[in-house]
Amino acid sequence: ATGVDARWYDRIMADFEPGTELFDHNYRPGMQPAPWGWSAASAALLRQQGVPQEALPTAEALDRIRLLSHRRTAATVQGLVAAQLPFPIADAAVECTAVDAIPLLLKAGRQFIAKLPWSSSGRGLLDSRKCSPEHFIRQAEGMIHSQGSFMLETAYERVADFAMLFDCEASGSCRFAGYSLFDTTPSGQYTSNLLLPDSEIESRLAQYVPCEQLHAIQQALATALAKVCREVYSGPAGVDMLIADTPRGFLVDATVEINFRMTMGRVAHTLAERYVMPGAEARFKVVSGSASDATPVVDARRLSGGSLLLNPPSPHFNFVIQIG
């Protein structure tokens, strides 16, 4: 490969022995393309790199994945999950094609978050707690003009942001793959991941919600995802959730967002599992600007202190694990 910082690469290979070779991005026969997520744009980029059309999804398959990625899928799955549970979870988001009822709801003191139907990772959000009613309505109308509708959901006081990770098959199966625990802004914009084993994440969530409820939600989600992915999508899925502090007690919003693609949570889960020393308090984040001062402390092929640069050094932004 060209253009890779040799000093960074040699240190990664020496410290961690990741068991993989660095290779260029040119297609070789027999390779199975696996982009971060499937879209018309990612398929076109792969085609430009020499990947033959027969190795790529058809245009019809890409259209089905795009429809699956609409936020109304999360609302549908929330309803399917709620129907399987003997305890309450947060209400599903509502798709709105007009703003007629919004002024009365805001006047009554309700607080909402409006979301663009095709958006993710905390982008495309409008929080009524952070703007005037007039601004909220005007921006919501802009969402309708841009994407035909918006999703409206209650704005909660969140005490925990986490995700359940799944592997889905278009044949109609879905397997739980682990947890992700992350930090967000009050409106839900992603900032960083904690790198912890699943058992520790579940223990932290159990401060608010019994493990039995988490397991029931996990099973209900697997059933619901298997249903909506059948004959449409095979690959990783990350279901973002939150635990809200409400007058009714702590409440799980089980489908804040569903990402039918690779996610930062899946990356964090893999990093925690393979490269972080058990018991270390590690965090995975994207750092703007240079991170040339990253200095790792490595024991037995595991990061035990300091910070580790996960990509060749860049002056623009860097993926970093920090401990402490």
Predicted regions and their residues:
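Conserved N-proximal alpha/beta basic substrate-recognition cap immediately N-terminal to
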Residues: 2-104
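Glycine-rich phosphate-binding loop of ATP-grasp-fold ATP-dependent ligases
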Residues: 91-92, 111-137, 162-163, 186-205
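ATP-grasp fold ATP-binding core
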Residues: 92, 105-127, 145-158, 239, ...
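Phosphate-binding site of ATP-dependent enzymes
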Residues: 109, 133-191, 242-255
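A short catalytic or substrate-binding loop motif that flags glycine-/basic-rich loops and adjacent residues
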Residues: 118-119, 155-159, 231-235, 312-314
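A long amphipathic alpha-helix within ATP-dependent nucleotide-binding catalytic cores
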Residues: 147, 189-251, 289-290, 294-305
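ATP-dependent carboxylate/phosphate-activation module, predominantly the ATP-grasp catalytic core
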Residues: 166-223, 232, 259-285
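Peripheral (often C-terminal) accessory segments that flank ATP-dependent C-N-forming ligase machineries
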Residues: 276-324
